[in-house]
């Protein structure tokens, strides 16, 4: 309603109202103009309200048959005379009229009874005290907790365990090589003992500050990442007292029912991989049990529209999300593509194909997708199933996806031909578009970004030299020699990246622009955080060629780590490998014990220690046995040689 029509206009006169005799004799007999206006305003508003209410009232004909809405809904209304033989006779259901009315009445009574029961239950709830409500909630929580505990302590089905071939030994005959191996073992002892003293139970160690350290990939909880990551290294080095200390901590303290958001990828390769390796090496059931408990906590991460898992998951709530920086909320190729080895072993050990089906679904989805230039972009949106920005790398964000294609084939005793085919296709595309030779003759692997090649190689990509050597046997067109040579060229390039620094340690990434070759240009790329990839490649090439240069290069790296990274409280990364005096970052990474020192130890050991025809190393250097299955089911009987 608009108000201007009710307001007095200039020049308009309002006739006096005859209001009858005054209620109170002592009042004036006449009213002022303003008082008359107020009365007129009130009267106008009252009349408007009455007329408005009349027009806005609902049509009463809509409610002639209200009665809970049952008669018109449950028994259709029939107008008089429609279909009737005699006018004036009402037929609702013909001869069954009484039966239907009885059914209607019973249904109406049931609905009323249910309604009254629900009201009574609600009243009863409201009558309860806060203490009673809290007690009921706690009872329900206890039931859920007990169910979880029962699930966690259930006995896993017995399965034949592959033979523990070459889990110890490997003593070199050459005394000089043995001295070098003993030195690596001493470095491991120094790293472990200081973690044991200053960071026990924490994820990692700050060796200069001498206290625990953690990053967001492990969440907010103290999950003992270094303990789990280092167990298999301790075992193969024969440090059994230290191994038992770690086992006791895991039995008594490792708990996954914590409100902590963790990286699915990192927890899989470090924790599940580490626990599975410790189980296969030692035979201790606690490691298998813990691995399965943790794996169940990761499964909610796969609850996405496409089945591509989130990067992060809360271990308690199961809520997942992706990294905010990852191309419009995409999942990362190297993360969701680096689950296959561990999940296949989980299905084998439990008889539960859920894990196997999760990773096979990822593979099938990737096979169907169009790949620009045959390359896999680093980003995939888990909601839409579409690629993010077209950035392809064999280094960070992409690396271990290609590694796991090859290792899925090797771990299956070379029967997973689909994985091998995908690996071969990918390597051919990488050779065509990413691998180049610099003016100085150094072979490097660049990165493809939005249609052009960036002539930069990361330290993480240096693992590829070992991958090419590992995949040489079984390659297409009898190109084994070619890929072994390609691996050697990558190893030489990565060695140059070490040799061209003041500390003889490699930078995080290095360029090949003009006169600049195998050298970091930006300050943010000059750090070394105890990474293993170059030494990993040396070890694989040593195993396949026994060329002494790889042991020599590995020893150079070990001496550089000892000189520039060793501190009284452990080992630390350095911020600038080109500065002659090291500035430490004060972090002893868990992968230094899991990978770097393990690969150095194996480099100076005999080939009978963890032979490659029986063991396949996951991307965190945790050895998992080849599964030689007698039939197509993962939980079937393996034909172990």
UniProtKB/Swiss-Prot annotation:
Alphabetized, the UniProt keywords read: Acetylation, Calcium, Disulfide bond, Glycoprotein, Glycosidase, Golgi apparatus, Hydrolase, Membrane, Metal-binding, Signal-anchor, Transmembrane, Transmembrane helix
Note the superkingdom of the native organism: Eukaryota
Cofactor names = Ca(2+)
Catalytic site residues? 508 (proton donor)
Summary of activators and inhibitors of this protein: Inhibited by both 1-deoxymannojirimycin and kifunensine.
Cellular compartment(s): Golgi apparatus membrane
Disulfide bonding pattern of the chain? 462-494
Which segments does the topology annotation call Cytoplasmic?
A: 2-36
Spell out where the chain crosses the membrane: 37-57
State its Enzyme Commission number(s): 3.2.1.113
Record: glycosylation sites: 631
GO function terms (MF aspect): calcium ion binding; mannosyl-oligosaccharide 1,2-alpha-mannosidase activity
Write down what this protein is called.
Answer: Mannosyl-oligosaccharide 1,2-alpha-mannosidase IB
Q: Which organism is it from?
A: Mus musculus
Q: Which gene encodes it?
A: Man1a2
């Amino acid at each position: 309603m608009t108000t201007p029509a009710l307001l007095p206009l200039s020049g308009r006169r309002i006739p006096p109202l005859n209001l009858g005799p005054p209620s109170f004799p002592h009042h004036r007999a006449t009213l002022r103009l303003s008082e008359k206006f107020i009365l007129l305003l009130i009267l106008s508003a009252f009349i408007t309200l009455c007329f408005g209410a009349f027009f806005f009232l609902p049509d009463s004909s809509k409610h002639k048959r209200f009665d809970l809405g049952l008669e018109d809904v449950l028994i259709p209304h029939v107008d008089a005379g429609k279909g009737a033989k005699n006018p004036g006779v009402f037929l609702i259901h013909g001869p069954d009229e009484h039966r239907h009315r009885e059914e209607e009445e019973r249904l109406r009574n049931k609905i009323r009874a249910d309604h009254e029961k629900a009201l009574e239950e609600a009243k009863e709830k409201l009558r309860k005290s806060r203490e009673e409500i809290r007690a009921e909630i706690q009872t329900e929580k206890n039931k859920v907790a007990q169910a979880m505990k029962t699930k966690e302590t259930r006995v896993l089905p017995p399965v034949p365990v592959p033979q523990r071939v070459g889990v110890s030994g490997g003593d070199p005959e050459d005394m000089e090589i043995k001295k070098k191996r003993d030195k690596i073992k001493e470095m491991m002892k120094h790293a472990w003992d200081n973690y044991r003293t200053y960071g026990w139970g924490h994820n990692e160690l700050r060796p200069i500050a001498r206290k625990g350290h953690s990053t967001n990939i492990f969440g907010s909880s103290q999950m003992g990442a270094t303990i789990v990551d280092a167990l298999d290294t301790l075992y193969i080095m024969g440090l059994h007292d230290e191994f038992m200390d770690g086992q006791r901590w895991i039995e008594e303290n490792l708990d996954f029912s914590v409100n902590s958001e963790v990286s699915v990828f990192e927890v899989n390769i470090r924790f599940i991989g580490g626990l599975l390796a410790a189980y296969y090496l030692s035979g201790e059931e606690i490691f298998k049990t813990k691995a399965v408990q943790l794996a169940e906590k990761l499964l909610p991460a796969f609850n996405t529209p496409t089945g591509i898992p989130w990067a992060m998951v809360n271990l308690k709530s199961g809520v997942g999300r992706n990294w905010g920086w990852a191309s419009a909320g995409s999942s990362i190729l190297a993360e969701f593509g680096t689950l296959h080895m561990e999940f296949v072993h989980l299905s084998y050990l439990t008889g539960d194909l859920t894990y196997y089906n999760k990773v096979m679904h990822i593979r099938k989805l990737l096979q169907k997708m169009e790949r620009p230039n045959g390359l896999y972009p680093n980003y995939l949106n888990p909601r839409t199933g579409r690629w993010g920005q077209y950035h392809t790398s064999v280094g960070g964000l992409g690396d271990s996806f290609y590694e796991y294609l090859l290792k899925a084939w090797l771990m299956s005793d070379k029967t997973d031909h689909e994985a091998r085919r995908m690996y071969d296709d990918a390597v051919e595309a990488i050779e065509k578009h990413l691998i180049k030779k610099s003016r100085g003759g150094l072979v490097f692997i660049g990165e493809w970004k939005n249609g052009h090649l960036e002539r930069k190689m990361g330290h993480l990509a240096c693992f590829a030299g070992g991958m090419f050597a590992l995949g040489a046997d079984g390659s297409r067109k009898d190109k084994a020699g070619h890929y072994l040579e390609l691996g050697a060229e990558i190893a030489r390039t990565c060695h140059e990246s070490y040799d061209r620094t003041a500390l003889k340690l490699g930078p995080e990434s290095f360029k090949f622009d003009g006169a600049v070759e195998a050298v970091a240009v930006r300050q943010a790329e000059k750090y070394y955080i105890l990474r293993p990839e170059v030494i990993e490649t040396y070890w694989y090439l040593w195993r396949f060629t026994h060329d002494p240069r790889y042991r020599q290069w590995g020893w150079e790296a070990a001496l550089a780590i000892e000189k520039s990274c060793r501190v009284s409280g452990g080992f630390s990364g350095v911020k600038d490998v080109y500065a002659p005096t090291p500035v430490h970052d004060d972090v002893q990474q868990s992968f230094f014990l899991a990978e770097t020192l393990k690969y150095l130890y194996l480099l100076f050991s005999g080939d009978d220690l963890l032979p490659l025809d029986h063991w396949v190393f996951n991307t965190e250097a945790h050895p998992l046995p080849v599964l030689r299955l007698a039939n197509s089911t993962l939980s079937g009987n393996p034909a172990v040689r």
